[in-house]
């Protein structure tokens, strides 16, 4: 990879900004100042800016605690999007949400620029689970439990895969739902089959990775390599 491209991707700057860094002698390769942007780097090379080593990251993976009222999209002409919440932290990255939450739903949204990984966790054949806390307007019933376990057939005839549902509150109004597929407004439509309405929906986990409880609504952080791997373990 060319040095100027490496700088643009790791220092999160434009090519022109990278050129300025090089011209000012602020960039070193293996400890020696380098001012040539077309220098080809080897995997073993260490690049630093102002003495601070840079680490190349092919892809970015972010955990966001989505607040109510924000849409799960990269761009939107009317509403704030999940990508808007990241601001200018990754100007050279084309981030997008891997999966969606409704505008009024909250919780774990994964943002990345890794299309292959996003496809893997969303593909039904991969069976990557998503776990939700759902607030209902009518208590959970045994009929609902059994129906979810067998696979609900929606009003339009769509047959869904089996899902898990269990009560989290004594009155049965707060429940946990675990899905392994994604259909538009799926949870609301599933409960709608039984005449139950959804008053609140919060995504707690994707695969084996739970939402960081220290993240307030609207906050985000990068995932470690180990956390990215956890997503596909459940």
What are these regions (language model features)?
Residues 1-234:
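Basic, flexible Lys/Arg- and Gly-enriched helix-loop patches that mediate nucleic-acid binding at interfaces
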């Amino acid at each position: 990879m060319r040095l100027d491209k490496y700088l643009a991707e790791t220092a999160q700057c434009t090519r022109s900004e990278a050129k300025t860094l090089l011209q000012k002698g602020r960039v070193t390769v293996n400890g020696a100042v380098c001012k040539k942007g077309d220098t080809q780097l080897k995997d073993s090379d260490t690049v630093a800016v102002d003495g601070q080593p840079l680490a190349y990251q092919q892809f970015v993976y972010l955990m966001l605690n989505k607040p109510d009222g924000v849409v799960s999209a990269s761009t939107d002409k009317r509403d704030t999007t999940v990508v808007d919440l990241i601001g200018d932290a990754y100007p050279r990255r084309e981030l997008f949400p891997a999966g969606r939450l409704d505008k009024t739903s909250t919780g774990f949204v994964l943002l990345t620029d890794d299309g292959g990984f996003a496809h893997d966790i969303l593909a039904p054949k991969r069976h990557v689970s998503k776990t939700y806390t759902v607030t209902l307007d009518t208590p959970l019933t045994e009929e609902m439990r059994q129906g979810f376990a067998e696979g609900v057939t929606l009003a339009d005839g769509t047959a869904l895969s089996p899902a898990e549902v269990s009560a989290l509150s004594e009155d049965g109004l707060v429940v946990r739902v675990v899905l392994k597929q994604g259909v538009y407004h799926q949870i609301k439509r599933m409960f709608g089959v039984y005449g139950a309405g959804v008053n609140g929906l919060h995504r707690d986990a994707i695969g084996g990775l739970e939402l960081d409880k220290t993240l307030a609504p609207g906050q985000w952080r990068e995932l470690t390599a180990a956390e990215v791997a956890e997503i596909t373990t459940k």
